[in-house]
Amino acid sequence: MILNFIPHQTNSNNIKQNSMAQVNAYLTFNGNCEEAFNFYKSVFGGEFPYIGRFGDMPPSEDGKQVPDEDKNKIMHVSLPISQETVLMGSDTAGEWASHHVVGNNISISINTDSKEEADRLFNGLSEGGTVTMPLAETFWGAYFGMWTDKFGINWMVNYDDPAKMQH
């Protein structure tokens, strides 16, 4: 059976169907994210709507600073490659992201339409798995969390509150 996904509707079998804003691939690199994304840009075309570096981050709550050797590494970059898909990525940096292994460097990134949807997906999909970054408000303004599910798949969920994103 093929279901048409219509926001907050039910099909003839009374199965609730949900909509999601966007599902994208998130690629993690060991220091060469900028080089890789410039290559992808040369093939796909387009522009980077955002490039953030680890040096742009504020100090952590315990006062730790980003080491000088990591400050120019990419914290987040995005490259729209179609109307539906954005390729996103970052470098690993510091002890909190030292587990880069080819094979575990791809995550499924979900951008939700509401904070409640982010909570529901995070809580449901992380059950039995390992939370690597608890779902919380971030310094860049998003409600964001990361985990590895019980099947070993890496996930991210992000909600951008439109009221916070307008400057």
Walk through the language-model features, giving the residues of each.
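Glyoxalase I/VOC metalloenzyme domain signal
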Residues: 2-133, 146-167
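Acidic interhelical loop/turn segments
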Residues: 134-138
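Short, small/polar residue-rich loop motifs at catalytic or cofactor-binding pockets
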Residues: 73, 139-142
